[in-house]
């Protein structure tokens, strides 16, 4: 094997090519590879963070849903208690109003009964006097017989 100028020229050209690649081609390629590795690592870390955030958000949503259900149950129970209270108050008011109306009606009936009795007594007294006048066929002196009429009215 002869070392001649061609091999020596090729070796120098190869060394220059390697030096040129190491100086100008290799750093941008390594920078691009490192940048891509960093982007991939950041993407994986971001995906992991997003997964943790999603789990946390789901847990918070579940907790809020449970709290909302509990609050709704409390509100429903309060509404049911208020409804029962309103019904009881309405029943009590209706009962009081009924009792008031019944009492007024009984008072009116009693007053009407007394008035009718008094009217009936007066009419009976007039009829008794008229009947007595016809029987006796003379006029009864009202002043003299007022005691008899008063007793008759009192008995009726």
From Swiss-Prot:
* Record-linked Pfam families: ATP-synt_B
The protein here is known as ATP synthase subunit b
The main place the protein resides is membrane
Q: What does it do?
A: F(1)F(0) ATP synthase produces ATP from ADP in the presence of a proton or sodium gradient. F-type ATPases consist of two structural domains, F(1) containing the extramembraneous catalytic core and F(0) containing the membrane proton channel, linked together by a central stalk and a peripheral stalk. During catalysis, ATP synthesis in the catalytic domain of F(1) is coupled via a rotary mechanism of the central stalk subunits to proton translocation.
Where on the tree of life does the source sit, at the highest rank? Bacteria
An annotated GO cellular component of this protein is: plasma membrane
Q: How does it sit in the membrane?
A: Single-pass membrane protein
How does the annotation summarize its subunit structure? F-type ATPases have 2 components, F(1) - the catalytic core - and F(0) - the membrane proton channel. F(1) has five subunits: alpha(3), beta(3), gamma(1), delta(1), epsilon(1). F(0) has three main subunits: a(1), b(2) and c(10-14). The alpha and beta chains form an alternating ring which encloses part of the gamma chain. F(1) is attached to F(0) by a central stalk formed by the gamma and epsilon chains, while a peripheral stalk is formed by the delta and b chains.
InterPro entries in the record, alphabetically? ATP_synth_B-like_membr_sf (IPR028987), ATP_synth_b/b'su_bac/chlpt (IPR002146), ATP_synth_F0_bsu_bac (IPR005864), ATP_synthase_B_chain (IPR050059)
Family of this protein: Belongs to the ATPase B chain family.
Please list every transmembrane segment annotated in the UniProt record, as residue ranges: 7-26
Compartment list = Cell inner membrane
- Which keywords does the record carry? ATP synthesis, Cell inner membrane, Cell membrane, CF(0), Hydrogen ion transport, Ion transport, Membrane, Transmembrane, Transmembrane helix, Transport
Whichever gene encodes this chain, its name is: atpF
The GO terms this record gives for MF are: proton-transporting ATP synthase activity, rotational mechanism; proton-transporting ATPase activity, rotational mechanism
